[in-house]
Amino acid sequence: MQVLRFTVNKINKNMDLLPNITLGYHVYDSCGDPRLAIGSVLQILSGPGNVVPNYYCQDKGHIAGFIGDQSTISSLPIAQLLGIYGYLQISYGFTDPVLNDRTLYPYYFSTGSNERVQHIAIAELVEHLGWTWVIILAVDDDHAERESKNLSNEITQHGACVDFIGTLTEDKDTNIRTLERIQKSTAEVVILCGQTFHTNSLYYFVETMIKDKTLVVPVTWVSHYTLFLFNGSLCFKEMIFNFDEITAFTTYVLAIKEDMLLKDTMMTEYCFTHDKEKDTLFQWVYEASFMNCSHSQLPFQTYYPSHQVYRAVYGLAHAEHNLLSANLNKEINKKIQQKKLHQYVRNVHFTEREIHFNELVKSPVKYAIFSLYSTENTMITEIEIGEYSWKESGGSLEINTKEIIWKKDTNNQILKSQCSENCPPGYRKVSREGAPPCCYDCASCSEGQISIFSGN
């Protein structure tokens, strides 16, 4: 939220971008719930007071567009609703390939990367590390089911096999059976997929059941990896914001330190308060150490900005600028202007980082890859071990495997996750009936033949 305020404030001070226009905003928290998201959108469309669909009761200003949501689960129904009214929507989260359909969703754009790019990055990491037998774990919803299948297909195309796709539901007995199956699997690697778990209790339950497995944590889970569940895991994070922007954002936050909204949403969440019981509870829930915050510092987690939000707000502002510039000295009906805005966001192009709003799968993406491990005080620490870069022409993975801290003792070797051991020289693979190609037996080579490479 603070990134939104910072960006709007910066735009309003720029007299060249939107002269004689002041941007404002309404902020609603969807909590990743589609019902809350739709309710919030209808409230904004109706104006203050009771929600009245198809009526706009705001007495001043007009809606330029919507920023959000981060979750595809809530972004999809928002896109369906806003498509009826013709309002521009710019999401700052990962984008389901379904939303790429410009016929169905002409008003939807995103500053986040496409889910398929993340799937490719994970599949190439699995291939690079020589893992051929993995498990995919997701929560039980329609989007996760579709995303899990897409990820499984991508992993298969890169030569590995998926033992099974596990889903966690609201039923504890079902979850126990799923997690017991993970425990018994010969796969050492579990790849998390889709949205994060709904409750902290589910995190701790999963941690207890599969504590010996190595996790691959996608970008969508990055805000939750402080939990001990992710000890010994590999994590993707999108590389964002240069140092100058972080400095500017920090300066902005410190300048409004007396803002009660800022205090409520940030300072009390990460800093010691006068309520010791609350401090103890929050530190236990978030597994994070609080600090005695002064007015000259902020905890790092609170001021590391989301570049996706920053670019989404600027994208909307530049689209509005382009629309107004193309219609100078013309009277434009607000309704017509609203429905034309999406045509101008297609041509928005940022110089500090190449991004094309009109093609969700063409914008270059760069992920940092981290090895997560717990320290003596049980805090999760990260070491950057590599990066993955993706452009329309293809991807590039660079990783230093020697820096990875594995959950198990691997004798300084890369962790193995295979259904079957490599066949030694002199032996060949024999397929098992009904089993995936990664699961096989080894048999002696026929007389007069020999396998000279291990694994053939």
What name fits each language-model region?
Residues M1-G24, S30-Q43, G47-N50, Y55-S74, ...:
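Extracellular ectodomain signature
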Residues G93-Y107:
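Flexible loop/hinge segments that line or gate small-molecule binding clefts
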